[in-house]
Structures are given as structure tokens and as C-alpha cells.
Amino acid sequence: MDTPDSASRVFCGRFLSMVNTDDVNAIILAQKNMLDRFEKTNEMLLNFNNLSSVRLQQMSERFMHHTRTLVDMKRDLDSIFRRIRTLKGKLARQHPEAFSHIPEGSFLEDEDEDPIPPSITTTIATSEQSTGSCDTSPDTVSPSLSPGFEDLSHIQPGSPAINGHRQTDDEEETHEE
């Protein structure tokens, strides 16, 4: 009888003869090609990820800058409209007959219907470490600071006027119609 060494050798020899070395080499080559492709793809994805994170940071900064600008503009416009309402109220108290045909609610409006949500201002305040915005607008409106401001101080109280000129009876009738 054959020895156990010879039986195992025969079995291994037959098992190895069943495997085609060309097929094994082709599989190894295909695996190397796939590995190269995966490494290149991985490198491209890493580059894309890095580029995307840089762009996201840039766009986030721009978005925050534009958001701050819009919030500042809204705050400035609110201040301007509040001043206009205050001036209208003062003029209405000083010259009630000039404002008699205008309903009181139309020139003494409350704050806007859509105020800035606190979450936006909180987000802006917490996301930046700035010294704050500088409000250069004056607290009171004066003729010397506001170009185009019409000085109405020379008009006598109780006389309706448009553009600094007193109206005649004929003109009043045409403006009331």
C-alpha cells in the first residue's frame, strides 16, 4: 500500500492540476486593476470632499454676510419708518385739519406684521465674533441732515399747505375730490 505521504501528495497533485494557472493569473490581474481603480476613485472622492468642504465654508461665510446685511437693512428701514410715523403723528397733532381726511390708522401704523424672527438674529450673533454693527443714522431727523427735507416752519398753524404753499379755496376743492 501507499504510504500516507504519497496519498496526500497524490491528492494535492490532482487538486493543483485541476486549477488552471492562467485563470488564477487572470483573476489576480483583474483584482489588481480593480484595486487601482478603487484607489483612484477613493482619491477623487477625497479631493471632491475637501473641495466641497472649502466651498461650503466660503458659501456659509457669504450667506452669513448677506444675512447680516439684510438684517441691518431691515433694522434701518424699521427705524426710518418709525421716524416717519413719528413725524406724521407730530404733524397730525400740529395740523389736524390737514390730516382730517386721512384715517388715523393709516399714518399711525403699528410695527410691521413680519418682524425679524429672534432665531435669525441669535444665529447671526452667535456665529460671529464681531464688534457689532455701527448705526450711523441720526436718532432725530433734522433739515440740515436730511437732503430734500421740506422746512414747514414758516407756515402758520391751522393753514393747510402742500409743498410749502398755501392753498386757495379752488385748489382745496380739487385736492379733496
Curated annotation (Swiss-Prot):
The organism of origin for this protein: Mus musculus
General function of this protein: As part of the BORC complex may play a role in lysosomes movement and localization at the cell periphery. Associated with the cytosolic face of lysosomes, the BORC complex may recruit ARL8B and couple lysosomes to microtubule plus-end-directed kinesin motor. May also be involved in the biogenesis of lysosome-related organelles such as melanosomes.
Deletion consequences: Show defects in the lysosome-related organelles (LRO) biogenesis, mimicking mildly the human Hermansky-Pudlak syndrome (HPS).
Cystine connections: none
Modification sites for N-acetylmethionine: 1
Keywords: Acetylation, Lysosome, Membrane
Protein name, as recorded: KxDL motif-containing protein 1
Domain of life: Eukaryota
